[in-house]
Amino acid sequence: MGIAGKTLNRIGRFYRQNIVKVQYPMLTSLSRRILKKEGTLGVVYMLHHICEKDAKLIPTNEDLKVSPAFLEEIILKYKKLGFDFVSLDQLNEMICSGVPNRRPFVAFTIDDGYLDNYTNALPVFEKYDVPFTIFVATDFIDKKAILWWDCVEELTMTHESVTTSDGKTYPCQTFQQRWNTFRYLRERILNLDQNCLEQGLNDMFARYDIDWYGPIKEKGMTWSQVEELADLPLCTIGGHTVSHPSLKKISPEEAEQEIREGIERIAQFIKQPVRYFAYPYGTPHEIGEREFRIIERLGIQLAFMAHQGCITVDNMKHVTRLPRVYLKE
């Protein structure tokens, strides 16, 4: 066995022996199986909100949150084990050169562009000198994003039941009922026409007076904050489309436009090329070969899914569909 093979096996053994201990609350059974394979090189974490959780709210939304203290704990555990913290530029260099990192690595990525990325996550990453990437959906920054998941959650929290325009009524009196109702409504919303989402939502919830743009006015970053982050050595800004659509639900031309215009708008503000991308929602239900070809055509160097998995010798070659691990507190 050559030096490279010995290095990969050493890294694989290190991961199998240590990473499950570090991540024991967060790893799914799928992640555990992946980590047992030879050739595991590193893990790219996916986060959304860095803020305190609220046990009274819908778990589907709360699972997108990790507290600053928890993020700090994860960083400290990896530091203690001797893992390297890498930027996406460093990961890209590994992939392009074909030379893996000599030690297991961790990369942190955050999706969407929430304000708490700036107020809560940045201080933690700066404290420990850890690089990170924020994948920005530009409508979040332009305050045009419809955070329907927050609006629907509020609806379930403030009504004993929710009745949609087709006459179906969903109970909301208990915690479990609210959660079930949210999940049912979520599936229906994801199947709406993404090109006229607001109209579809208004039609579905015609009985209620909902300000679909209310949440983003409070929860989104500003362009000046994005620019400030982009100027920091630790932070990379990546693309995440314009409006965060389910890409499979729109035409090929519209999907390419969403990806391209999002990247161009970010580049316009940060005065830097945008080389990396994360797919909205990011599972095989929302993306496929068509989207991978668009990424290749646009010259994006690395694109990330929400699919659970670590970076391995095999999948690191597929730069349009790299997996991530969902960091869950």
List each language-model region with its residue ranges:
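A short acidic, amphipathic alpha-helical/loop segment
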Residues: 120-124, 225, 290-294
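Short, well-structured alpha-helical interface segments that form or flank functional binding sites
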Residues: 73, 116, 120, 221-224
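Solvent-exposed, non-membrane alpha-helical residues enriched in polar/charged side chains
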Residues: 76, 111, 122, 226-227
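A broadly conserved amphipathic alpha-helix scaffold signal in soluble, globular proteins
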Residues: 76, 119-126, 202
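Intrinsic-disorder-associated interaction segments
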Residues: 1-4, 8, 12-13, 20, ...
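C-terminal active-site subregion of NodB/CE4 polysaccharide deacetylases
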Residues: 2-108, 116, 147, 153, ...
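Conserved beta-strand->loop/alpha-helix structural units within folded catalytic cores of enzymes
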Residues: 111-113, 118, 128-133
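Metal-dependent polysaccharide deacetylase catalytic core of the NodB/CE4 family, i.e.
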Residues: 45, 50-51, 103-106, 126-285, ...
